[in-house]
Amino acid sequence: MNLNANDRRRQARRRLPRFVFDYVDGGAETEDCLRRNEADLAALHLVPTALRDTRHADPGITVFGRRWAAPLGVAPVGFSGLVRPHGDTLLACAAAATGVPHVLSTPSNDRLEAVREAALRRDPEALQWMQLYVMGDRAIAEQLVRRARAAGYSALVLTVDAAVSGLRERDVRNGFRLPFRFTPSTLLDLALHPRWSLAMAMQGRSPSFVNLAEADDGATSPQLQAALLSRTMDRTLAWEHLAWLRRLWDGPLLVKGLLHPGDAALAVRHGADGIVVSNHGGRQLDAAPSTISVLPRMVDAVAGRIPVFVDGGFRRGSDVVKALAAVAGHAPDRGARGVLAGLVDDIARTLVLLGADRVDEVAPHHLLANLPFPGSAGLSHAGARHG
C-alpha cells in the first residue's frame, strides 16, 4: 500500500530498471550530502501545544500574489520522461490538481508549451514556473526564456549550482551516461523490467530533450541533444548577469542553488525576487551541508526582503513544518498527485497536532532541535521556556 513518499520510492525501486532508479535516487560521490538532508531533518523534533482552537486549520499560503494550497511545490526534475512517458506533463498536472506550483526543468522531455497546456486543462489557475540553465551559448537560454514567457509560465528559476556536473558514482557503476549506450547488463536489466520497457517501446522513441532541441536547430538526434546538454555550463555567469535576465523576463526571478548567506544577500542586492536554498538534492557537492542546517542563516541574510524557498530531504509534511519552525522569527514575515495530496494533508494534520491554525502560527517554541546548526540551541531553549 502506497501511503507516503517512502512507499512510492520502494515501489519505484521494484518497477524501474536499476540504472533508471539509481539515476533518480542517487547523489554525488559517497552520497553523504544526500543522507545529511534527511538525517538533519530527522534530528529536529516538533513540540505540540495543547488546548488551542484548530477547527479552521489551513495550510495555504500566498506567494507572489498567488494562493498555494500548502507551502510546498514540485522542484525541477530533469529527464523525468525516463521514469515514465510524459513524466513532465504528469508532474505538472499533479501539481495543478493539488494547487501547488510545478517547476519545469530545462532538460525536460515534453515541450514546455504542451506541459503548460496540459496543466491549464487540469486547472485554469495552474501555477507553473520555468527552471533555467545557462550554457555557453546564451542564445539558447534567451530562446527558452522567451518561449516560457509566451506560454504563460509565471516565474523563472535560474539554477546556479551546476557549473560542472557532480560525480554520480551510481551512474558510473551502472554505465549510465549520455548519449545512452546499451550493454549486456543494461539489456538484462530491461528484460527484468518488462512493464517499463514496454511503456518506453510504445513511445516509438527514446526520451529526448525537446526544448533544448528546439533552441538549437542542429540538435536533431538524442545523441546531439545529449552533447548539447553536456556542454560546459557558462562559467562566466556572474551576479551582474541577473540584469540580462531581467531584461528578458518581467515576472518573478529566483536564484536556485544557494547555501552561503553572502550569496543570499547578493541575490537581494542584484534584484532577485526570491532564492531557493538547495544543494541539488545532494547530487553536486557531496561535502555540502544539508539545506535545513543553513536555512536560518539564509533567511536572516535576506531579512524579509524576498521569499526564501528550500529543498532537499523533505519526505513528510512534518518536514515542511520543521523548516517553517526553524526560521520563524528569523526575519519579518512577508507573507505525483497522490504524494502531493498526502503532503498537503500531512501539513494540515501536523498544524492541528501542534495547536496551530495557519502556517504563520508555527513558531520557534514548536521546535526541539538536536542539530548543531546556528540558532539550534536557542530553538531548544525556546521550546523549554514556552508556557
Name each model feature, range by range.
Residues M1-G65, P179-L237, E361-V362, L368-G387:
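An N-cap/entry alpha-helix motif that binds or orients negatively charged groups
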Residues P17, V74, A95, L158, ...:
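Conserved, mostly hydrophobic/aromatic
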Residues A57, G78, L167-N174, L178, ...:
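Glycine/Thr-rich beta-alpha phosphate-binding loop at enzyme active sites
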Residues L72-A75, H102-L104, Q128-L132, L156, ...:
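Hydrophobic faces of well-ordered beta-strands that scaffold small-molecule active sites
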Residues T106-S108, M135, T236, L254-P261, ...:
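Glycine-rich beta-to-alpha transition loops that act as phosphate-gripper elements at the mouths
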Residues V115-L127, P184, D234-L253, D286-V310, ...:
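Alpha-helix-loop-beta-strand connector modules within alpha/beta enzyme cores
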Residues E142-V145, L259-G271, M298-V310, F314-A325, ...:
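Catalytic cores of alpha/beta
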Residues V160-G166, A272-A288, V320-G338:
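Glycine-rich phosphate-binding active-site loops on the catalytic face of alpha/beta enzymes
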